[in-house]
Amino acid sequence: MAAARGRRDGAGRAKIRSIHPMSRLFRDVEGGLLCPRGSVVCIGAFDGLHLGHRALVRHTVARARALGLPAVALSFEPLPREFFAAANPPPRLLLPRGRVEGLLGLGVDHLGLLRFDAAFAAMPAEAFVRQVLVGRLGAREVWIGPEFRFGHRRGGDLALLQAMGAELGFSAAQIAPVEAAGGRVSSTRIREALRAGDFATAAALLGRPYTIGGRVVRGRQLGRTLGYPTANLRFPKVPALSGIYATWVHGVGERPWPSVSSFGTRPTVEGVEPLLEAHLFDFAGDLYGRHIEVEFVARLRDEEKFPDLPALIRQMHLDAQQARHILSESERLRATA
């Protein structure tokens, strides 16, 4: 997917053109009526696109199809919690590209990935309803998840939507909470599971295995020097992981490729920026520039600083052996499931 390109209007405000070839993705809150016949809209952060998010989006799409109207999902970039905690943002469950592709893949006709900046944060909830939901999208129905809030100081909720809808000609409702793995599905629970290395619970809440995708970039090639060449992924947003993992890499061949991966700053070699490094077992190809997905199966250990490179190499041998064993057992269980 091509990167968004920005330009400035006469007032110096950033204007973002659609970055989807079918013009299904928009970033601006200004502009003409996008859905002249009306629309069915859902709103949320959608970080992770977990089972609760998917239930909300699928319900919105079903309602839109029943009414013969376009389905619209509204979200934000950066996420509001990232904007308000810029110095220490919560870790991402799903990177921007994955969120866009996931939402469009659920069948929405338009996706609003609205730029969350200081001006947007200061917009009163009432103005958001009038300007965006009605003025931009012609909303006929608005759907939200449990406890969703919007607008300046989180002043908008379901009651406000319903009151303004009665005035402006749309209905508003929320879907029921989704339960899985012994409790309510939430992004917080998923982050806790990932931090604990509990990928089974994370997968149960997400409705799929936890993966991180990105384009393979050139690193310092230290892994090759140490006998463990890696496919390196950098991220604009820090995922909710840190440590050494048994992983599958998708996008290399017809089947997932067994691998051992490290996410962190590589303290033994004085690394600084977070980097995901995936060593694919018995692989000899060139992956530079290719988009791959790394599926996390098990957490092996914390990232740590070793006294010297020989000590690091010895541990890498142990990590690789453990990852091979875990993945072999995982593959056996899949085959008999």
Q: What does each model-identified segment do?
A:
Residues 80-86, 184-185, 304-305:
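A short acidic, helix-capping loop that chelates divalent metal ions and anchors anionic groups
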Residues 162-265, 337:
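Glycine-rich, Lys/Arg-enriched anion-binding loops that position phosphate/diphosphate groups
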Residues 82-168:
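N-terminal Rossmann-like or analogous alpha/beta NTP/dinucleotide-binding catalytic cores
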Residues 1-14:
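Compositionally biased, low-complexity flexible segments
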Residues 50, 103, 142, 202, ...:
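Residue-level signal for inorganic ion chemistry
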Residues 219-337:
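Phosphate/ribose-recognition catalytic cores of enzymes acting on nucleotide-derived substrates
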Residues 15-43:
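Positively charged, low-complexity intrinsically disordered leader regions
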Residues 32-95, 101:
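N-terminal catalytic cores of NTP/NDP-binding nucleotidyl/phosphoryl-transfer enzymes
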